[in-house]
Amino acid sequence: MYCTPNLLEKWAKYTVDINKNYIRKNSYDFHLITKPFDASVTHAWQKIPAMLMLFQENKYEYVMYIDTDAIFYDQTIKIEDIINKYQGDIIVCSDEANSAGKYKVNGGALIVKNTPAAIELLIRWWELRNEYKEFAFEQWALSDIVENKIDGIDGSIISVAPETEFNSVYNEVQTYANDTSKPPPNRFVHHFMAMDDKTREHVFSKLYDELVPENDRQYLISAGK
């Protein structure tokens, strides 16, 4: 995860803890990055060098990135379950339902395999940061890569999964945000994109109470806050 420090004082403390609890239960490694690699571009781009940094250690076969405003909800599902369904070195979810077809993919969560082709694509994607300075930033660039609109970048190594595989359809998360008395759909990941801080604080504190048992909270960052 990449998160700016100011958000950790707000709703992000809940999402970090929810996700860290999922990671701990499944014996994965969890990395929280809070310092930008290039402060001249928006935070949305920082996920790319964060993943490249982890691959430099040559410790991981796969790295999964998830946005700060997204959480692992159905915690019985394993990341390997997704990996085994798709052939691409990079797996990402569609954003067509959320953007009326404008963007092919959503950059809020992606799974990357440690292969030369995937690492080269991440490097080339990062190099586009000064060319895609308007919304949707890195997501727009990745959508163009998927559609093979950028010379010299092979988008064929990317598998595009449905929105609800490990991301969200906006209408679903918006419905839950409007009425948290009813549970959200039982999805692997819920991504509460394009919502204000007050809404996210309410939603994530509610989901934190649901997903993180009290006896597990001693392991998490909010225990010290």
Task: Annotate each PLM feature.
Residues 60, 86-89, 185-187:
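Short, high-confidence coil segments that cap the C-terminus of an alpha-helix
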Residues 50, 90, 109-111, 189:
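Conserved hydrophobic/aromatic beta-strand scaffold that supports enzyme active sites
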Residues 33-35, 93, 161-163:
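Conserved beta-strand termini and adjacent loop/short-helix elements that scaffold enzyme active sites
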Residues 70-107:
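Conserved donor-nucleotide/metal-binding helix-loop-beta segment in metal-dependent transferases, i.e.
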Residues 1-61, 116, 216-218:
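N-terminal anchoring/stem segment of glycosyltransferases
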Residues 42-49, 117-225:
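Catalytic core and acceptor-binding pocket of nucleotide-sugar-dependent glycosyltransferases
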Residues 106-121:
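Conserved nucleotide-sugar donor-binding
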